[in-house]
Amino acid sequence: MFERERTRHRFTARTATVSAVETVGAYVRVTLTGPDFADFASTGPTDHVRVFFPNPLTGELLAPVADEEEGVIRPDGPTFGRDFTPLNVRDTDGGRSFDLDVLRHPDPGPAAAWAEHAQVGDRLVVVGPRGSAGAPQDAERALLVVDGTSLPAASRFLDDLPESTSVDVLAFGDLTGDAAESYLASERAFAVFEAAGDLVTEARDLAPDAGTFVFAAGEASALTPLRRYLRRELGLSAAQVVMSGYWRRGVVAWDHHAPIDPYDPD
């Protein structure tokens, strides 16, 4: 149960050109395209690409370049790369395109600061994804626990989970239930709850069980007690609990591959 179809993609660096910029709620949506994306694929809701932005002081774009058919050559010197969920991969008159939703911040880093002033014709470099893992097709229920950084991934789960799976969304951190519901507007039915207090208490009230698939992502320290509750107290398997710390408060350029709980890693 909870098997996810896995697909490997050609891993390379691609030069991207901005073809559109718009505001979507709390996000700047940037549409990227370019000849390098003819074979670009992203078929899993937890996919991420590494996007390289210009140096905010000099404007220079230092980034990896493609190494022949596959792989990348990394440059000497500091780069400004951040991970994002690719959205709405599609073929257009201008070629294959996809969207990045960049969350606005009151104290923006390189990505958010760039997005505030992004213009059609601007260039970035995109690396990945290496592969995809699809949404499980046999879950009776899905619980998506998200803050503003992981809301785009939740939208992909809503698209990819079968209609037979009932879906609850639990918004935490600075993300309100109303904002989550507005962003996730979908043709399928789903319920949104807001974690006004302790995240474990809120999750306990939603009663995840043996038939529930859980995706939880966002601020890492907030997710640590939730992971202990799901994995240790409830005994849910690693296959049915997919959890990722997209960022950690007080840490710059946090590695989302790091374990949520370093004292109890999978």
How does the language model describe each region?
Residues 1-266:
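Extended, composition-driven regions rather than compact fold-specific motifs
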